[in-house]
Amino acid sequence: MPSKNCAKNLHACQWERDIALVFLGLMVLFNIGQVVYMNRARLYRLIRRGAEQIPADDEEPIIGIRD
């Protein structure tokens, strides 16, 4: 909450706003991290499934790329 002096001097309460924004940003990052950590098994499964679909030896290489 801004202090009562903010109405008189707006520059005096800028640090309060900055601290609140940093705190809010850290809370958002923490919550995103919790969601990722909670669903990490599902994410790892999706990554593994996507990696299995990559062929080891491509029958039709991209035109212009030669070994």
Curated annotation (Swiss-Prot):
Function summary: Plays a role in RNA-mediated gene silencing by mediating transport of both ingested and endogenous dsRNA between cells. Not required for the uptake of dsRNA from the intestinal lumen.
Main location: membrane
Protein name: Systemic RNA interference defective protein 5
GO terms of biological process kind: regulatory ncRNA-mediated post-transcriptional gene silencing; RNA transport
Native organism taxonomy: Eukaryota, Metazoa, Ecdysozoa, Nematoda, Chromadorea
Subcellular location: Late endosome membrane
Cytoplasmic compartment spans: 40-67
Tissues where this protein is expressed: Ubiquitously present in most tissues tested. Expressed in the somatic cells of intestine, muscle, neurons, somatic gonad and embryos but not in the germline (at protein level).
